[in-house]
Each structure stands twice: as C-alpha cells, then as structure tokens.
Design a protein with these regions (language model features):
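Extracytoplasmic cell-surface/polysaccharide-interacting catalytic and binding patches
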Residues: 20-124, 136-137, 141-227, 236-249
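Bacterial N-terminal signal peptides that target proteins for export
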Residues: 1-9
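Short, low-complexity intrinsically disordered segments
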Residues: 6, 227-228
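Conserved metal-phosphate-binding beta-hairpin within the catalytic cores
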Residues: 232
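A short acidic (Asp/Glu
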Residues: 131-135
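Segments that shape or occlude catalytic/ligand-binding pockets
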Residues: 127
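Short, linear, compositionally biased motifs with a strong N-terminal bias
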Residues: 10-14
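C-terminal motif of bacterial Sec signal peptides marking the signal peptidase cleavage site
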Residues: 16-18
C-alpha cells in the first residue's frame, strides 16, 4: 500500500512539473491593415514621327514628368466608339506644359487622399487630321453631336489643351464611374448626377469616384464640361483658346 502511494505521489509531482514547464500562449495584437501605395515605372521609348512633331511644337510627354500617371490612349487602339485605330504612331500623352503642370498637381493631390490610386489618361493632344477622320465617320449619324466639327472650329484636344482621364487602382483597373469612357448618354453627364443617382442610373460608389476625380482635377485649376465626366480643359475662355497653337497636321 505504501509502495502504491509512493508511486501515485511521484506521478503527481511529475505531472505538475510538466504543466509548469509548458510554454505560455502569448496573444499578439492584430496587425493594422496596410494602405496600398501604388507606384508605376514607365518605360521610355523613342518618339515616333508624330510624337516628334508634337514635341517640336513645345508639347510635353506627361509620362516623362511623372511615370506614376498611367497612359492608355484609346484611339491608338481599335477599341473605341468608332471601332477603328486612329492614332497609328501616337501612344504618348502629349499636352501643353501648362496643362501638364496642372495634371501633375492633380496626381499629387490624389496620392495624398488615396495613395492606392493613380490618374489614367485616355486622350490628350489630337492632330487636326485625326479630328477630320473622326468627323467624317460620324457625319450623318446619331453620334454627330458628340464629335467636334473641324470645319466650324476646333476642340481643346486639337490644341493640346484638354485631357480625358479617369482613376485607376494598383491592379491597372479603372474605377467604376457610372458609364464607360466615350459613352454618349445622360449617364456620362456631370450636371445631373444627383438625379442619376436617385433614378438608379449610377451608384453611390460611382458618384463618389467621379467626385474624387473632379476634386483633384478642378482643384488643380482645370475645367469640366457637362456632357463628359472624363474631360477636363485647360481653360474655358474663348479668348485664351484663340492664343493657342493648333496641332494642324
């Protein structure tokens, strides 16, 4: 009996020792969510003949000033509302230096608010020859009101004084804005957005994205137009427009 008691006591002591040596579980605080910072590195390519002519006019390539601003010229592809490639040797976003400075300021303002976003440029300088080609394609169609008639005057793109732009996340995906780029319908308008929201034509998130884009672009001194949420002009003054040099080739 004494022998059994001794064995039981020894087992109990060993069990207590083992428990005391077991490592304690330490709870680590949850890691704070990281804010994704979006940066891109542009690849510098030699100018094509068209790009060289634009540069010779004093226009600047925005990517050389800030490579984090993404550029995808829609008219350099056939994936546009006309279904035809119109820029055959133009893939860089050239613009007047004054416009470029304002776009840079808009990008910097955007990064302060949303480090995970960048500006994405769809169009900038447009030679007059391309404008004629666009006009001839829409003449006599329902798309006529949405394309500037070069026989009656020229749009700001033809001076390097306008930019079509949206917001892009770090995966390269454009943020939803309630309509596609170059969509010709009321959903693209900027003067009736609260009504569009109330009617369910655009969502709250899409409106918030538009307002953020507009905040940084107009905050940099650029001007919107009522029919296109993506379009921003250097100036709204006809007097100032007449001082600009036409991209007449």
């Amino acid at each position: 009996m004494k022998k059994l008691l001794s064995i039981w006591l020894l087992s109990a002591v060993l069990l207590l020792c083992a428990c005391s040596q077991r490592p304690k579980t330490v709870e680590t605080p949850a890691e704070e969510p990281k804010v994704e910072v979006c940066d891109t590195l542009g690849v510098v390519n030699a100018d094509t003949p068209t790009e060289a002519r634009l540069r010779a006019m004093g226009l600047v390539d925005i990517s050389e000033m800030d490579s984090s601003i993404a550029v995808h010229l829609v008219y350099a592809t056939p994936y546009n509302f006309l279904g035809k490639q119109l820029y055959h040797d133009l893939t860089k976003a050239f613009m007047l230096p004054e416009l470029a400075e304002k776009v840079l300021n808009a990008q910097q303002a955007l990064k302060k608010i949303r480090p995970d976003l960048n500006l994405l440029i769809y169009d900038a300088s447009r030679p007059v020859s391309v404008q004629y080609e666009m006009w001839n394609m829409v003449k006599g169609t329902s798309m006529m009101p949405y394309v500037s008639n070069p026989n009656r005057g020229h749009g700001m793109h033809n001076y390097g004084a306008a930019v079509d732009v949206t917001l892009m996340d770090c995966t390269g995906r454009p943020l939803p804005m309630g309509s596609e780029y170059d969509y010709f319908g009321v959903e693209a308008n900027t003067n009736n957005e609260q009504q569009l929201l109330a009617e369910g034509r655009i969502t709250k998130r899409e409106l918030e994205n538009r307002l953020l884009l507009r905040k940084v672009m107009t905050g940099a001194g650029l001007h919107i137009i009522q029919s296109e949420w993506w379009h921003f002009n250097l100036t709204s003054s006809e007097t100032e427009r007449k001082k600009l040099q036409l991209i007449d080739f």
